Amino acid sequence: MKQVSSLLLSLGCCTLSQGIFLNSVTAQVTPDGTTSTTVNVNGNDFTIEQGDRAGGNLFHSFGEFSVPTDGSAFFNNSLDIDNIFSRVTGGNISNINGLLGANGTANLYLINPMGIIFGEGARLDLGGSFFGSTADSINFSDGEFSATDLANPPLITINAPIGLSFRDNPGDIVNRSDFREINSITNFVGQLDIVDRIGLQVNPGNNITLVGGDIVLEDSGITAPGGIINLGGLSAAGEIIFNPDGSLTFPDGVTRSDLTLSREATVNVRADGGGDINVNVRNLTMSERGQLIAGIAENQGFPGAQAGDITVNATESVRIFGVNEGISFPGFESEISNFVGLPLRKRDGSDTSVNGLGNAGGIFVNTNLLEIYNEGKLSSSVFPQAEGNSGAIVVNANTILVDSAPILSIIVRETGDVGDVTLNATESIDIVNGSVILAQSIGDAVGNSGNVTINTGSFSLLGRSQIIADKRGGTGDAGNITISATESVTMARLASDTSGTLFPQIIAQLQGNTVGNAGEIVISAPTISLANFALISANAAQDAIGNPGSVTLNGDRVTITEGAIIDALTETDFTGGDININANFLELSDGGKLVAGNDANGNGGDIELNITGDIILRNGNPPGDSPFGEQILRDLASETGIFANNALESTGSGGDITITADLIRFEDRGSISTGAFSGDGGDINIDTNFIVATPNQNSDIIANSVSGDGGRININAEALFGIEERPLNDTTNDINASSEFGLDGRISIFTPDTNTLQTEINLPNSLIESEKTVAQVCQNDRSSGITSGLNIKGKGGVPSIPTNPFNSETILVDEPLTNRDIKPIQTSLGDIYPARGIVKTEDGKIILTAYATDNLNPRTPQISTNCSISSIN
């Protein structure tokens, strides 16, 4: 295949029903007598003369229309004819195994409601466009040219056609045209022989339209360089409209037919610019290296040249299948792609490329279900020795499944921006078994990488699958990755993925020798789950000159478990990236980690957690050996937690950690840590109601440094349980901000004042001051100096003033009550009245009253002639 800027769409194979061959007859071209058409026969060659003319339109009508192998059917029209309209009325399929041709630049229309088969030897020799259809009639503004209504004379009009009319169950169109050309090109590796599958071909800038019934393309080609190829059809009665731009409008509410491409079937509009492929069907199936190609051909194009788009509208499904299981990027399988500078495979199997100049077009897929399997591919790329932008890839569906397949937008070594990849699915998107969603700029390219945007109900990234937006060399920024799900986002390595380096990844990164910034990763969903060594990373690698990105998670429940990691690391002198999580609940367990740090001389990144509910940090052991290298793990392989630590060789300071939560719970090596080697430790700021740690399980809050100063730890909490400020110890839960050679940091723990009056009071030495709370009611003994006293021991049940009334829960006193009035006792401090009632206010305060209250029997002590101090236990 040639190296081009192109769009490739792989199509699945189909099994052709034998019914399509019914009613086919021996190759022949015969008029039906309804027009003035004549046919001259010379062996296998048929020359078509006369016909009915109206202005620039010429009309022919045939009873049979089939062309034998190595034969031809040539329309010998005047050069000033614009359109040739041909209908087949005899009730048999047209088998075209030879050449169809016409004079001048006339467009050729061929309709046969029974079906059309283009055999291996079928070719076109036209100066204009070709329209093949199994419609009943061609519509005009003033009538129709019908192949089924022969009772009325055919319409002969000077107007341009406006569309096609179909009856129920129109015939199918099959293309097996396998005409090929061998072209030689020369590039930096020498001369290469390229075999192009041409098939049915028109001149550059002209169009090919095939409208059925079902359309079957197998082991064949359709080529319209820089033109438009329309493929589609209806399976029920309806009308299709011709648009001025060469595209078609299909009716709503009418069932469409199917399109299949298999056995290297190729649909190609690549040229020096332009070229669109439009597919309008019910189901599109692609397999065995079927391809839709649009773009800039090798050694063609010019600055600013724009390749066309591939647009697929499938009301039910699009299925793209490769040949082999697994992924082998150098080979070409079934795919939808948009290339500038197509990589070529030499006869020895090695890969090379040739140049092109211009921008790749876009890929637009609209369907209910998109499935891409086993090396099926969507790709928009600019390859070496080419120059320009890659195009956008946009999929709108209800359900998307990508299994062992890539969706790619790439620029390799040249100048240009990478196109964005956007996947929208109302129900679900599943990327599984080593599939890749990639927006990447590689080599010395000057330009930005593309963005990856995913909007869906539920999203899963499973097995060895990856989403990557990165910049590898050159100048420019890496792209952003945005995932929004109305239900859930799930990432996990599968149990069958036993290889140590295989794990699901979402990566926005800046790699070596790149000048630019890494992208942002934003994931939003009610439930976000990372498990079994899943990785989300926004980083800047060694030798890159630029800032790492950040990771933001927005959800209700976020769980990071079984060795999964979110990191915003950098190996540059720039500050590390940030991690932000906004949720109601956050769990880090079984080796799950948040890591923001710096391996060079910059400062570590910051981590900010805004959690309205609980944060749980527990169990430092991941479920097996981690596939992550020491760059990510540092010395944290057997820990769970939140880390803004710098590497040992780093001279920067640790990052800051800010946490807001209702409760933070530590279990078994759950940690919060910011540390540095030569720089200062970072700050940890925690605002929570409670911090609870299971005792003696080495769960720590640390802001340390080796050579620099320790960081600061500020904690605002109602209470801390099981963890306290002290030196680090593997058997305890510690809060520590120390430095080995520098100054220790500062730890500030703020808990609320326990005084419920919210004011400072100097408390007396005794709990109850008897001289103020015990009334001297022993009147007979006052003159003798004998005073009353009350010592209360025990808990509850006894009021602190002896004249207070008891409730039902107090102790019982077995003595009669007196009805004698008790007069107030006069003291230097004023009159003292025995309490006779108790009132509880609405805000919970208890007030003792000098008068009896309802439903309470005030307890008035019996006056004794001799009182003494008594003790109540």
Functional labels for PLM-detected ranges:
Residues 2-873:
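Extracellular and secretory-pathway beta-repeat/beta-biased strand scaffolds
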